[in-house]
Each structure stands twice: as C-alpha cells, then as structure tokens.
Design a protein with these regions (language model features):
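Conserved small/polar residues in nucleotide/adenosyl-binding loops
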Residues: 174-175
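Structural beta->alpha junctions
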Residues: 154-171
C-alpha cells in the first residue's frame, strides 16, 4: 500500500531534480541570455534578439567561465563579433547569416531570429545595433533554476502541487 502523500513527495523530488532542470534549460536554450546594449537601462531580450547564438550544451558545460559574445549589427547586413571567454578573445566579421565561428571552446553558430518582430530582424536594421549574448554553463543555470523553484502540495490530502519560480524575467518563466 502506497499513500498518495508519498507519491506526491516522490513527484516533488522529480520536479526538483537538477537533471530535469538541466533538460529544460538545454531544450529551451536558457543558458544563453541576450542584452540590448542600445537600451538604457540595458534590457534583456528573451526570445527577441535579432540574432541567435548557439553553442551545444555539451560544449557550453566545458567552458572555463561565461562566454561573452558582443555583436554589432550594421545596416549593411554585416555583423562584427567579439567573443571573450576566460583570458581568450576572438574577433570576426560576417557578411551574412547564418555563420559559424570555430573556437578552441567549440563552434559558435549565429542565426537570424525569424521569430522576432519585423523591425528588429537583422535584414531590417536601419542603424547600428549592439547586442551581447552571454553563454553560461547549462549545469550552473539548471542548478539556479532548481534552487529558485518552489513546489508544495496544495493540502495534505491532495496530489495537486503548486509550482512557483522566482525569476527576474517574467517572460522567460512562462515557457518553463
């Protein structure tokens, strides 16, 4: 005989697990954050960056620290990239997207974000834009999400739980 409260406790432990958080972080790409450097104050661009930066979660987990990818989008379609990770720095200019940038830490790929609003797509940039992407270690991000998660049964006799997440970006947690 297994009580419903022990089943709920087991489910809560599964929901709190770092491995489940890791899958969510990897699948949603939450280990990459984008900042619009032209806004004051600077603004996070959750799912609204005109350019998406990609590094596999496996490569990102091996980073010695956070990778900073500063991008300057020109009205001509050219994009200048400056990357910094640890003591290393890389620079490259791309004439068009998609583009790839092999580094010692892995291959960083750049894509136009066709899901963004028409006005912020790379091909519609009318003035120079400055976007910075930060690639973090997915496991560290997953730990942060797991630690920010609050899961509790609604009562002692129910199998319904309330899940809440403390997050500074109200848009991003709606996808979790």
């Amino acid at each position: 005989f297994v009580s419903s409260s022990s089943n709920v406790d087991n489910e809560i432990e599964v929901l709190r697990s770092k491995s489940l958080s890791g899958e969510v972080v990897n699948n949603l790409g939450l280990f990459v954050t984008y900042i619009d450097e032209d806004e004051f104050p600077k603004k996070e661009l959750y799912q609204a960056s005109p350019v998406l930066v990609s590094l596999t979660p496996q490569e990102a987990d091996k980073l010695p620290g956070r990778m900073e990818v500063a991008m300057t989008l020109q009205p001509t379609g050219v994009m200048d990239v400056q990357m910094r990770v640890g003591e290393k720095e890389y620079r490259r200019q791309f004439e068009k997207l998609p583009a790839v940038f092999p580094t010692d830490e892995g291959t960083v790929a750049f894509f136009a974000n066709n899901d963004t609003l028409f006005a912020v797509r790379p091909e519609n940039v009318t003035k120079e834009r400055h976007i910075t992407a930060f690639i973090n270690r997915p496991f560290s991000v997953a730990k942060g999400y797991a630690n920010s998660l609050s899961i509790a049964p609604t009562s002692k006799t129910t199998s319904v739980v309330v899940i809440s997440l403390k997050n500074t970006n109200p848009v991003s947690y709606t996808h979790l």
